[in-house]
Amino acid sequence: HLIPHMEFSAQVLNCLPVEGDKWQPRIDDLSNRSDFRQECVVSVDPPGCTDIDDALHCKDLGNNQLEVGVHIADVTHFIRPGSAIDREAAERGTTVYLADRRIDMVPGLLSSNLCSLISGRERLSFSCVWKINSKTGEIYQTKFSKSVIQSRASLTYAEAQTRIDDPEDQGEIAQSLRRLNSLAKILRAKRIEKGALVLASANEIRFVEVESETAENELVI
């Protein structure tokens, strides 16, 4: 199906940090970056997810104000424009997930490690931080910046829901998740009130082989 699936070339691999999985951000890497390493940042993903590309934090500022941060892995720190790895990623276009394997867009050292917001690891990111009214969802302030984070926890959806539902869990992570959950409900209600189109997505897509009019076999959903 013309999906690029060959091993990464030596030229591409030479673009990776020489420290490998022992890479740590240097002081120079952190200049001009907002520091969110002390915030209660967590990620929520499907079970088995290794390429954690986004994480969240939600802090109570008092007076019905929340600070909400969305942090996205800063892949551009490792992939320079026009480099061999940049050209290879452009050629591949996306990571392809098959039933029995995945075909990475970039080498696993980046996708599953250095550009994955793994809990307990310092990671470079892009952040959008809002100050929001916790009762109305009104946004008071928005700030974008390059940043550095250190996630507190890499949770599955079920693990996050368990923390939200457990009344005995009054830890920082659980309270942050509850604030995010409450705010999400407010924002969703506002979107629906304004006429948002809500589409249900199927949990599973099945492909069926059929015979076309040209007698060639085709795959259809």
Give residue spans per PLM region.
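Structured, non-catalytic alpha/beta "coupling" segments that mediate domain-domain communication
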Residues: H1-Q11
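Electropositive polyanion-binding surfaces
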Residues: A10-I221
